[in-house]
């Protein structure tokens, strides 16, 4: 199972990504969670302490590693476009509650779409992750898909956009769907988070095609408490976990 979970900051995509990761890990699956968000907080959501998170150096910031694998240095402007990265998930991931966390970091490719060694490195790692045959791979990503090439995107089992019940959030889904289509992805799914009432749910169901909507997660103060304390939502909110478990059941049926 290969999942890319995206959405604007604050909508709850990391709550979904971390909870799915822990649900799969509890089943005994091998789970690798990749944090590809500039505001990296997947580690906290999985159960790491703030001190442990602060000690992690993102792959994109490991200059020596990037130079070693790509051949790029200050004196050498030429570098490999397909560096060897197959060993990186095992070497540089951190185990937490049965999940291997790989903090990727991000690279600002700029408006011109320029490519640097760090960007090539991240794209190569993401591509390699999609070929881990029997593993569950969950990518927690920002709303842009800059680090996904056509081959990587087409290997994903599910693209999931987390939204809130609002017009701007729905527009994010539409933007991601357009970008994903350009990469050869046939379907983009949606999870609506922070749904407070029937009116919110009706808005979501009116804005999102039924075949794209995986489900809703209702607004839950327990999730807010977990975030304030820097704890994993998995350990705080049985209601939210049950709702995400129902979403997982749909994903499992489609995997099989």
Language model: regions and residue ranges:
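N-terminal phosphate/diphosphate-binding loop that engages ATP/GTP or pyrophosphate donors
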Residues: 23-97
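Conserved catalytic network of the ASCE P-loop NTPase/AAA+ motor domain
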Residues: 24, 93-94, 128-132, 153-154, ...
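Switch II (G3) loop of P-loop NTPases
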Residues: 104-110, 114-115, 126-148
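Inter-motif core of Ras-like GTPase G domains
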Residues: 124-133, 148-167
């Amino acid at each position: 199972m290969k999942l890319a979970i995206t959405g604007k900051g604050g909508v709850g995509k990391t709550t979904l990504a971390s909870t799915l990761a822990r649900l799969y890990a509890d089943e005994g699956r091998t789970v690798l969670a990749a944090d590809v968000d500039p505001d990296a907080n997947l580690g906290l959501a999985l159960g790491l302490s703030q001190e442990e998170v602060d000690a992690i150096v993102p792959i994109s910031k490991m200059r020596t590693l990037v130079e070693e694998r790509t051949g790029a240095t200050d004196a050498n402007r030429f570098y490999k476009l397909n560096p060897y990265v197959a060993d990186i998930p095992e070497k540089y991931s951190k185990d937490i509650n049965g999940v291997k966390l790989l903090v990727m970091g991000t690279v600002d490719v700029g408006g011109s779409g320029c490519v640097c060694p760090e960007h090539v490195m991240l794209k190569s790692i993401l591509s390699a992750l999609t070929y881990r045959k029997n593993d569950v791979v969950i990518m927690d990503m920002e709303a842009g898909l800059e680090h996904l090439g056509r081959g990587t995107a087409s290997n994903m089992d599910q693209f999931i956009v987390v939204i809130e019940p609002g017009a701007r959030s729905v527009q994010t889904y539409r933007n991601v769907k357009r970008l994903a289509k350009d990469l050869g992805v046939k379907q983009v799914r949606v999870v609506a988070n922070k749904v407070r009432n029937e009116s919110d749910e009706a808005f979501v169901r009116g804005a999102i095609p039924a075949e794209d909507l995986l489900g809703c997660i209702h607004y839950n103060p327990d999730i807010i408490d977990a975030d304030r304390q820097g704890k994993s939502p998995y350990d705080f909110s049985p209601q939210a976990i049950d709702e995400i478990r129902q979403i997982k059941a749909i994903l499992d049926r489609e995997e099989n």
